[in-house]
Amino acid sequence: MYVRHLGLRDFRSWAHADLELQPGRTVFIGSNGFGKTNLLEALWYSSTLGSHRVGTDAPLIRAGADRTVVSTIVVNDGRECAVDLEIAAGRANKARLNRSPVRSTREVLGVLRAVLFAPEDLALVRGDPSERRRYLDDLATLRRPAIAAVRADYDKVLRQRTALLKSLSGARHRGDRGALDTLDVWDSRLAEYGAQLMAARIDLVNQLAPEVEKAYQLLAPGSRAASIGYRSSLGAAAAAEVNAGDRDYLEAALLAGLAARRYAELERGVCLVGPHRDDLELWLGEQVAKGFASHGESWSLALSLRLAAYELLRADESDPVLLLDDVFAELDAARRRALAAVAESAEQVLVTAAVLEDIPAGWQARRLFVELRDTDAGRVSELRP
């Protein structure tokens, strides 16, 4: 799989871009702040419908514009597929697949399968659980695009149930059975969609675990072994059953958990049980990585998670596109060599670097230079002719 064309209109610092790409390695070189990362961000958005840098779409629209368009042509086993995504301020996003409008942007998921390595990856180890949940959900969706609908359904039910909890704290004490019966309905729906999402995550973690262990050993030979596990809000007592990933069990366990925590939920007005409170646990030896891993160990573990994702996607079908955003500058020589070795076998690798010296020695790659130019419409990124 490779991206043959990337087109941008008013995306971040790019007023206009039309890039013809090819298999193999391409390096975008430019000073920090010149917009090279925005190119990889656009490709990652086309792959996952989300940015690795911000949680909302509004910052992706260039200042002064009311919408942005990201267009890609992806080649997979000789077949071309065109995806156009329109991100609009204050309006629903739109998508076209092979120039035909689709009902939901989620229908383009799976066309471009990519793995992104970026400086922000340290948050996978050191950041909040939401970072690790997003890692799992993005990867699960790349492998099974239908998971996107499950995520959307769960998030919708979670918002509505939380709003109901906030409004019910007084009604509970007044004995408003009608309102509490409504909460029972939302409990059932939360458990249904939550069980589907948890089952997908747990299955993914079980497949990722050996790949993470192998990747970490490659990056840090002789170090403590790396391991991962899924920690649910259902508590340690149910860990073995939860990690089996049986959907019926998970649904029943979520319903029981919601019933057990109802008083606390009504008191606090928040939902305390469900996959939105789960985490991907990372271990080095017998020690939890977060808060205890060194900087080098944290980097190795973060890279291991990305390398494991790459291996799973590669095993599913064709090689995913590798996106490497300024990561070589962050790595020591050993980790550079390990990552470069993986990139050697990929069908397409797109890399950003501030200077040529950040690229591994001996790499044969097409070089494109990114510049920033002042115009009447502000400062815009351009490729040097």
From Swiss-Prot:
Family annotation (Gene3D superfamilies): P-loop containing nucleotide triphosphate hydrolases, RecF/RecN/SMC, N-terminal domain
Keywords of this entry: ATP-binding, Cytoplasm, DNA damage, DNA repair, DNA replication, DNA-binding, Nucleotide-binding, SOS response
An annotated GO BP: double-strand break repair
Source superkingdom: Bacteria
Subcellular localization: Cytoplasm
Major subcellular site: cytoplasm
One GO MF term: single-stranded DNA binding
Chain positions recorded as ATP binding sites: G30, S31, N32, G33, F34, G35, K36, T37
GO cellular component terms listed in the entry, alphabetical order: cytoplasm
CDD domains: ABC_RecF
Described function: The RecF protein is involved in DNA metabolism; it is required for DNA replication and normal SOS inducibility. RecF binds preferentially to single-stranded, linear DNA. It also seems to bind ATP.
HAMAP family xrefs: RecF
Family affiliation: Belongs to the RecF family.
Protein name according to UniProt: DNA replication and repair protein RecF
Source organism: Mycobacterium avium (strain 104)
Lineage: Bacteria, Bacillati, Actinomycetota, Actinomycetes, Mycobacteriales
